[in-house]
Amino acid sequence: MAPKRQSPLPLQKKKPRPPPALGLEETSASAGLPKKGEKEQQEAIEHIDEVQNEIDRLNEQDSEEILKVEQKYNKLRQPFFQKRSELIAKIPNFGVTTFVNHPQVSSLLGEEDEEALHYLTKVEVTEFEDIKSGYRIDFYFDENPYFENKVFSKEFHLNESGDPSSKSTKIKWKSGKDVTKRSSQTQNKASRKRQHEEPESFFTWFTDHSDAGADELEEVIKDDIWPNPLQYYLVPDMDDEEGGEDDDDDDDDGDEGEEELEDIDEGDEDEGEEDEDDDEGEEGEEDEGEDD
């Protein structure tokens, strides 16, 4: 599984902290420390604070340089992402198969969601140029009986304070085809409620902006599926695996049967040898009788 990479938060400019105005005499007395050497301790504390300011400065510089490296490699990856998308387009139902095979995404998919996702042709994740301010996820669809849109987009933004927000394309549902409404009605009839993390329909996610910071689906798509979708498309069929195990068991049973047959044959051979010995003994007794 590809390692998850989180977009760094915006950098906060840190002001150097002034040396702490500690009542050292009072502190020393309350801690039971001797007053001797208080001046040296005060100087040490001031120097520690100066060193800490330098550490903070380096941490800030480190974050800025990491962002530059990320920006560089994002540009280098783009041609390969484009080539991968072109190849994926040659495989029917690649997108819906990938989502269905992913354990977290599949739990959000209803039957009608899967039907609509069969028209999905491409998914793309695009980070904003500065990276730290957010990214966009685009879903491309063929002509279908569910909605008019050819592209759905959902954007995630981080402001200067690091607070997340999101916005998305409005889905133009065709008459009577809004799967989010039907899903909601079905759940009301069954008197069931889902948590925020599990919307009634996969497509409800596009209109849910209530808590962008707790959006698990966008993290899964961006940090898990997008880096390497092939690993989920190629998930082996569990039925095939179980069938293979049954075949192995049958082979083992067959081997055991052959061993039992071999044991029986060996037993028959032993009995045959004993019969020959008995016959030889009887012949010997008859010969002795004739001599007499």
Swiss-Prot record:
Keywords in alphabetical order: Activator, Coiled coil, Cytoplasm, Differentiation, Nucleus, Transcription, Transcription regulation
Matching Pfam families: NAP
Coiled coil: 35-78
Any one GO BP annotation for this protein: endothelial cell differentiation
Segments for region (Disordered): 1-43, 158-292
Gene3D superfamilies found in the cross-reference section: 1.20.5.1500, Nucleosome assembly protein
Bias (Low complexity) ranges: 1-11
Chief place of localization: cytoplasm
GO cellular component entries: chromatin; cytoplasm; lipid droplet; nucleoplasm; nucleus
Reported induction: Up-regulated during protein-induced pluripotent stem (PiPS) endothelial cell differention. Up-regulated by VEGFA and POU2F1 (at protein level).
InterPro entries: NAP-like_sf (IPR037231), NAP_family (IPR002164)
Entry GO MF terms: chromatin binding; histone binding
Compositionally skewed regions (Acidic residues) per UniProt: 237-292
Tissue: Expressed in endothelial cell (EC) and protein-induced pluripotent stem (PiPS) endothelial cell (EC) (at protein level).
Extra remark: Probable retrogene derived from SET transcript.
Similarity section: Belongs to the nucleosome assembly protein (NAP) family.
Function, as annotated: Plays a role as a transcriptional activator involved in the early stage of somatic cell reprogramming. Promotes the differentiation of protein-induced pluripotent stem (PiPS) cells into endothelial cells and the formation of vascular-like tubes (in vitro). Involved in the transcription induction of vascular endothelial-cadherin (VE-cadherin) expression. Associates to the VE-cadherin gene promoter.
Protein name: Protein SETSIP
Species in which this protein is naturally found: Homo sapiens (Human)
